[in-house]
Every structure is written in C-alpha cells, then in structure tokens.
Amino acid sequence: MKVAVLGAGAWGTALAGHLAARHDTLLWARDAALIAGLQARHENSRYLDGIALPDALRYDADLGAALAHGAADDALCVIAAPVAGLRTLCHAMRDAGCVPAHVVWVCKGFEADTHLLPHQVIAAELPEQQSNGVLSGPSFAREVGRSLPVALTVASASAECRERTLAAFHHGAMRIYTGDDVVGVEVGGAVKNVLAIATGISDGLGLGLNARAALITRGLAEMSRLGVALGGRAETFTGLTGLGDLILTATGDLSRNRTVGLQLAAGRTLNDILGALGHVAEGVRCAQAVLALARAQSIDMPITQAVCGVLFDGIAPRDAVSGLLRRDARAE
C-alpha cells in the first residue's frame, strides 16, 4: 500500500516510521529545511530527536507529489497537521487539484474560532471527500517511534476507510480497533487535553493521588456529557479514545498538557510555559472552545471552567481548586 503522511511533527513522524515498516510511505512537510534534515539523517531532530527512522521512509516538501502518492488506487492519505493548521492544509490540498480518495486524520481538538471538530472542517473544505475517518487513542509519539505497544481506534462512517486504515496501521506493536462514532472519538481526543491540564495543576500543587483520581473520574463525566450532547455515543467515552486517552494524558510524564498544568502550579506564566515547551499543547488551544460549546448546550463542566479561569482569567491555581471544592454537594 502507498501511504502519504501530511505533517512531519512528532506524531506524523512517528506514524510514518511505523507505516514505512510495511508500506511505501512518504512523509510531507512544507518546511524544506526540515525535509532536507530528514533526508540527510533519517531522524527528526526538531520534533522527535533520538528516534531513528526506517531507511525505506521517503520525504518530500512538494505537496503535489505527496498528494499524488496518497491518491493512488491502493493508497491512504494521513493528515497529521494540528487542528489549528487543518483548514489551511485542506485549502492547499484543494488548490493542488488532487484530493486523495481515502483520508484519515490524527489531529485532536476543536478549531479555535469556529469550535468545529476536525471532521466538520474537512467536510466544509473538501466536500467531495467521502471516505474518511479519525485515528485516535492513548498514544505518545515517542513511544510509537520506539515501537512500543499501542492500541488505537479508527472511526469512520465508511467501511472502506476503516478497512484501509486497519490494513495500513495494524502490524508490529500497533493494534487497531474499528468503529463509526466519529464525533465521540473526536470529542474524547479534544476534552482529555483540557482535563490533563487540571490533573497537572493538582499534581503540581501536591494535592495527592486521591485528588487526581477524582479529577479524572469527574472529568470523564464532563467529557461524556458534552460528547453525547454533540452527537457521540456514551459508550465511546469508556473506551480507548475517551477514558484510555484521558488516563494517559493526565498521568503520563510525556504529556505536554499535563506539563502545562504542572508548570502553572509552580507559578510560571502561560506564555513562558508555551515558549519553553516548543510544541503544541492542544488543551490550551481548545479549552475556551470546549467551555463555549458546553455553555451553548447548557452542560455543567466545572473542571473545564476552572482550567479556563487559570489559563485566561488570571485565577491562581490553588484558588481554582478551592472553587471546585466549595461547589454544592450533588448526586453522582
């Protein structure tokens, strides 16, 4: 199978390395200098340093060439751009005049200005593209790059897209499950990043494992309420792309969103944290969108509201926690 991976960040690079073990894989990035470095060293020293990439993996800064590769009869196109760049990439794909027949995306979050999920952005920008889906689940790029075990879910309304994605990714240490709840999978992947900031704050303040467990559990309830209101199925949120991804992102030391929370608890400013991080922290980008959607649906999401207060309203982390503890008692 031919596979084109659009986006050479940490996640796109790790997935391309995995795919290249079995398939004719081409990794694209718009940054010619990044591509030149990949071609010379077979390592993404900018985003995934220390991980050797397969010799068979090819690289290109020409989007047209990458799209042609991913548009072959027996091919798959993987969009690994962040949500913030998804619409721009779709524009570029359309302008290139070559939209692959089978597309799967791996980005997580809501578009900041529109509050749209990735599938809604793609439907608006590439309406002719019908065989598509989302690949998501509890996964750190560095561990996938090291070929450590991982389980992911592909969700799509298209059986052909599910089968093609399964054929591409299900090998080696990667196990793929299939489903059709695109909305549920996407909401889980977005909201868990916001909740991971909350658990990072709690851990950074030294509030203990009891508090962490409470935040994860009540956070899962928030995620499920919003997801069901937006059209997802409740059972999706107890699976890999809901609870599984939440546990990993909220507790794993490789989590950028958890790191944001830890650093906020230590008294650092958000601008300083993001500057030092050097990578995307999707929980910061989409927190306000999550809260706005919750309010529009009249859904109570107190943990998300507390995170937004710390990120954007100048509320001290300890005061945000105190506010949660002062909430009226209620039935679970």
Curated annotation (Swiss-Prot):
List the top taxonomic levels of the source: Bacteria, Pseudomonadati, Pseudomonadota, Betaproteobacteria, Burkholderiales
Source organism superkingdom: Bacteria
Binding residue positions for sn-glycerol 3-phosphate: 108, 137, 139, 192, 245, 255-257
The record's subcellular location field reads:
Cytoplasm
Give the organism the record lists: Burkholderia orbicola (strain MC0-3)
Q: Which GO terms describe its cellular component?
A: cytosol
Sequence positions that bind NADPH:
11, 30, 108, 141, 256, 280, 282
- Give the UniProt record's GO annotations in the biological process aspect: carbohydrate metabolic process; glycerol-3-phosphate biosynthetic process; glycerol-3-phosphate catabolic process; glycerophospholipid metabolic process; phospholipid biosynthetic process
Which PANTHER family does the entry mention?
GLYCEROL-3-PHOSPHATE DEHYDROGENASE (PTHR11728), GLYCEROL-3-PHOSPHATE DEHYDROGENASE [NAD(+)] 2, CHLOROPLASTIC (PTHR11728:SF1)
Tell me the protein's name.
Answer: Glycerol-3-phosphate dehydrogenase [NAD(P)+]
Q: What class of enzyme is it?
A: oxidoreductase
